[in-house]
Amino acid sequence: MTIESTNSFVVPSDTELIDVTPLGSTKLFQPIKVGNNVLPQRIAYVPTTRFRASKDHIPSDLQLNYYNARSQYPGTLIITEATFASERGGIDLHVPGIYNDAQAKSWKKINEAIHGNGSFSSVQLWYLGRVANAKDLKDSGLPLIAPSAVYWDENSEKLAKEAGNELRALTEEEIDHIVEVEYPNAAKHALEAGFDYVEIHGAHGYLLDQFLNLASNKRTDKYGCGSIENRARLLLRVVDKLIEVVGANRLALRLSPWASFQGMEIEGEEIHSYILQQLQQRADNGQQLAYISLVEPRVTGIYDVSLKDQQGRSNEFAYKIWKGNFIRAGNYTYDAPEFKTLINDLKNDRTIIGFSRFFTSNPDLVEKLKLGKPLNYYNREEFYKYYNYGYNSYDESEKQVIGKPLA
């Protein structure tokens, strides 16, 4: 199979440019140890959902070219797009999974390209919960499940009722199955696929975050009752189980303390401090995670947050609790070309900076940041399409090209 060159990606001539001051002499380009690996610089591509897998959730040739291009700068940490941990976890078309052999074999080809470029990979395990597509689940004989039967908005309730697949609360037996079977199965396939790290998606209003959040968790059992310990129980059970499967030094977690995306209420420091305390206790006993990824208060899901609404919100509290590595991500280009916030947030030796949207339009983002070359502004209109246009190419003919399974 032919892998396209990075140089084949040419954006439209009217694309807006963002000026960049060279960052090659900053801490961004100093090494950092993450688990058992030493990354030569501190830039990560954090997950961007793009819908370019095959319709049956197998990674495609389009994704192979995409991740190969974005891992060309040696030592880049590529955290692949949110990836379904099980069929029950989500069934949206063209979203990749990591729960069967064909998916693992396809991801392995992508990882071989990433590793061949001298870079590193992490897979983000995704479980949708109440924000899943009720009709698609119904068509596959699967339920729409969540911590509690609380819809995230009126439209999602309407669609679920029309599909005849109304939202219901998970039973404790189903929760046990998620912890003991579904997540471990995905993690084992991730190891078979050659991923360096496995990241648990605990952010942005998806299932694990739904348990954390009072807006979505109305349970009256050991996973609810309003208490922090109960609401965090499922997340920490998943962490502990996957430590057994992949090892703590290959495991990671993503959190979004300040997000109000998909019907969530901002939980802020309290419950996230508890989670970090629990993870630090595990680290003190020799089970330190590879990294914790934090979403900055500048963004909530796919939306930017106004400066006014960011006031009083910061992820600095996390450094006082967790002593391991952090990835921090969320609109770090807002103060370009100087990148003063980025430089300030690198003041310690435990931080990696994540970029997402600008990686979509700049396969060579790492080199551009190092040398101070202008960045192409991203085109969100093409983020969630199935074809190759706006993904690996801007040739109009690529609107007819859909990804083919790699295995």
UniProtKB/Swiss-Prot annotation:
Which catalysed reactions does the entry list for this protein?
A + NADPH + H(+) = AH2 + NADP(+)
Do you know which CDD domains this protein is assigned to?
OYE_like_FMN
Coiled-coil regions listed = none
Tell me which EC number(s) this protein carries. 1.6.99.1
* Cofactor(s) demanded: FMN
Q: What SUPFAM superfamilies does this protein's entry cite? A: FMN-linked oxidoreductases (SSF51395)
Going by the record, the broad EC class of this enzyme is: oxidoreductase
The residues the record assigns to binding FMN are: 49, 124, 254, 357
Give the domain of life. Eukaryota
Kindly identify the residues recorded as the active site: 206
What function does the entry list? Oxidoreductase that binds mammalian estrogens with high affinity.
Protein family according to the UniProt entry: Belongs to the NADH:flavin oxidoreductase/NADH oxidase family.
This protein's name: Probable NADPH dehydrogenase
Source organism per entry reads: Candida albicans (strain SC5314 / ATCC MYA-2876) (Yeast)
Q: Which gene encodes it?
A: EBP1
